[in-house]
Amino acid sequence: MTTGNWWAAALCESVNGEKPLAVVCNGEALVLFRNATGELCALEDRCPHRRVPLALGTVTPKGLQCGYHGWTFNGSTGMCTTIPNLREDERVPSRYGARAYRVAESHGFVHVWLGEGSPDDSPLPGADYQPRGSEFSGAAVVNIAHGEYLAAMLDGPECLLEFGSVRMTDFFLGDPRLEAGRLVVDRGAVWTTRMLPPAFVIDHPLIVRTAVPLEGGTIRVELLDADEAPLVTLSIASSANRRGTTSLCWRGFRHDTRVPGAPLRWHLARARARAPFRIHPMIDGAALAALLVAPSRDLAAARAARFAPVSEAA
């Protein structure tokens, strides 16, 4: 049985053949780079010789060279190919190597296979993200544990992100539902204007849809109009970092949907090619603590049901 998952660890454009990129994905320290042929590579970010981070090294035609003693590692296999102080008649022992990970590119993200099993029969996540027009992307490490980040994305996404000229409400439009391995929640939203009505709103011209994966994958967030036509789509990769923090990288775009009722600021931002959303790099602890636990209960229940042993599930 396959127990591993594909995890989006970085944006494709962040990984090159000049400087290795250090990331922490699902708690594992990795180094990403491209070899001399442009092939994407992922190794454990630790030299087996003196445990120095390989991300401090240099990409060479032969692989990734450790910055401490110059050991060089093949990016595809992790095998050590060069040790500078060996004589010409000496060979590098085959047991010397760094752990290599299966890695792939898809829909603008670098995905790394973490865990047991083979990824051959596991499709890469994010196939439902099909950008059109200009994209807006970024990365951050935020001050919240990964499990809490996913829960807040369901209970109160306004603590984590915002859409320009939009105010999210706590009015849920229907019950949470499972779709393609994600728990999906719809909530009402309104345009923010100087003539903003009272806090109690009965008409919601906008919908914010958040879809959180049960395991691995990417978070999908959409801003929709009342007829569920998409206005903005985001794909957010999240995973556990160190000391209770969360690694994020994201991509998003604005659709060509006409929005007659949008305020002038929305149209001006579009004309000036400004990002229609913002991912908060710092989380407001007071706002997070005030969130009521609601749809995230269903996320915990769905995970328990999905990953329960066969005997228990029966």
Segments predicted by a language model, with ranges:
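Generic detection of intrinsically disordered/low-complexity segments and helix-coil linkers/edges
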Residues: 1, 63-67, 185
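Glycine/proline-rich, flexible active-site/cofactor-binding loop segments
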Residues: 8
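Hydrophobic, proline/glycine-rich low-complexity stretches
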Residues: 1-5, 23
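Acidic, low-complexity intrinsically disordered regions
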Residues: 2-3, 67, 109, 262
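Rieske [2Fe-2S] iron-sulfur-binding domain
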Residues: 11-125
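C-terminal catalytic domain of Rieske-type non-heme iron oxygenases
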Residues: 123-314
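Short, low-complexity intrinsically disordered segments
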Residues: 4-5, 69, 111, 189
